Amino acid sequence: KATIAAAKTRYPDRRLVICFQPHTYSRSSYLLDKFISCFEGIDKLLILDTFPARETEADGLSAKELLARLEIKDTSHVDSVSEAIDHVVNLLEPGDVFIGVGAGDVTDVPWGVLPRLQNLAWESLAVQKEELNPNN
């Protein structure tokens, strides 16, 4: 909640995109009410599969079940870090604020998104340069 509040304070007019990975099924179940309120104010939420640690899905709430109970308009479930990276790269628009939070390998998502966006920017510049100088 504090991270989202800080991002909204710092970037009040920007779209806020969050990728979240719950930590354990039992914790997702136990903290459901807090999860519902902590994501208020975001524009897009992606939820990765729960980082299970020592648990099985029978121990509580899965990421898909958590997603179904959240009252956020624009949400998506992704099965893997690579799927999350692809989804975020296709979703982000100039000026968006993107944050990955949670347990497990969700921290790999921003690090995977950054080079992909950099490559897209370089490709765009190359196309623009070619359009400006078609004889080179």
Regions found by a protein language model. Name each.
Residues 1-136:
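ATP-dependent carboxylate-amine ligase
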